[in-house]
Amino acid sequence: MLGDSVTTDHISPAGNIKKDSPAGRYLQEQGVEPKDFNSYGSRRGNHEVMMRGTFANIRIKNEMLGGEEGGNTIHVPSGEKLAIYDAAMRYQQEHTPLVIIAGKEYGTGSSRDWAAKGTNLLGVKAVIAESFERIHRSNLVGMGVLPLQFVDGQTRQSLNLTGHEVISIRGLSDGIQPHEILEVDVKGPNGVASHFNVLCRIDTLNEVEYFKAGGILHYVLRNLIAG
């Protein structure tokens, strides 16, 4: 659960790797000394490091933790505080797909491809935000992550979303269309159910095909295999 102006550097930092971060722990397990960690940017060819670095920026604020800075979150339903990577891996073991909820201008800043790649590798299937930066929106679709936009002036605050809800998105199996209005079902931790509408920010028919294939790389490979 993120706020406004979440940048691609918040999502996929390029700075130094902390010793006690998921990426730092991984490198030490591979026999790399902390003095040789270097930066995320220098290791962008290593998906194991980069996926562990996704949402690991020390300045990112997760509203599930009251706006506390750092790449942590709350695992639902256990309530355990974990690094975002560690929580994502637990959710994958539990076969739970993930949704990010955010405010305005999601994905601003430099066009960093790992911001979308890492999001996909963590098991995120959709991002619901008030607005998206143009290139990052396109990159999300290209990685098979669905960008959805609040409508009718609604926000995470007006809908009283906390990040502890179970989110279900209707209509995805029916053949999604550009700029389609989709319905989101919400079940709160107290069992109370509600719903709201979102605008599908898949903007073109080509993007529909990329998304249906699971991303642009899958789309290209399937076309090559098909002849």
Segments (PLM) and residue ranges:
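Fe-S-dependent hydro-lyases/dehydratases of central metabolism
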Residues: 1-227
